[in-house]
Amino acid sequence: MDEKRLTHLRQLEAESIHIIREVAAEFGNPVMLYSIGKDSSVMLHLARKAFFPGNLPFPLLHVDTGWKFREMYEFRDHTAKAFGCELLVHRNPEGVAMGINPFVHGSAKHTDIMKTEGLKQALNKYGFDAAFGGARRDEEKSRAKERIYSFRDRFHRWDPKNQRPELWHNYNGQINKGESIRVFPLSNWTELDIWQYIFLEKIDIVPLYLAKPRPVVERDGMLLMVDDDRIDLQPGEVITQKMVRFRTLGCWPLTGAVESEAQTLPAIIEEMLISTTSERQGRMIDRDQSGSMELKKRQGYF
């Protein structure tokens, strides 16, 4: 890695650590949202650096849908134990009672009930006034215009027309009772930055990011990995083995794999250098309707 690139990554690292420390000092009850993906792994690594040699001064929160990949659950539990992190797991009990299923109810309803409502329930339950998230501006257009300190009203809603200025790395965290801030320390990182930093810092990631033969079924132009026996095969669908990996991770029935031979981090970085598509193309929830991500964020989504 050349010196300019290394300096760029260290500048991003310093900015993110500064933001994380600012939140810890400014807010009374912060939490780090931990979705188990590559961005969460980088964000957790930065947080551990920010407070080393001490422990994290806030817990991790995983909003569980019951439909994550099995390897994600294993990685989550191993990581929390290895780093001595307090891990809070919340699953929407109302959604569980309703039997919400992405195959039956679709991506929009599943995401709204199990993710958006589940997140709001957890934030209310524990009274968190700030929540770190791993979103980046290069991922999607609504995230591109969101501030690092993203103000949310008492219903956890985001108003893109009512955002606060952030000049010269000054962040306004003033809130009234019931309001909160979503904080995005990785806002200025790109997908390539993330992968190069993971390689540089030797950060552990879920093995699903690396290519290997996996059972998949093609549906709506996406390759869905068959992770357990809850798969709902449609007429004419056949499970086949393909060499695939994931650029983004979510609920397995709603996350598409990509055909790839990249079995190592350097190989992934090579792919990123020539990629012309967003990693979010593998998320079915982004295809619900035009502007679906912004609509979800207005309703309280991550």
UniProtKB/Swiss-Prot annotation:
Covalent S-S links between cysteines: none
Catalytic activity: sulfate + ATP + H(+) = adenosine 5'-phosphosulfate + diphosphate
Protein origin, superkingdom: Bacteria
Family: Belongs to the PAPS reductase family. CysD subfamily.
One term of GO molecular function: ATP binding
Name of this chain's protein: Sulfate adenylyltransferase subunit 2
Record lineage: Bacteria, Pseudomonadati, Pseudomonadota, Gammaproteobacteria, Enterobacterales
GO biological process: hydrogen sulfide biosynthetic process; sulfate assimilation
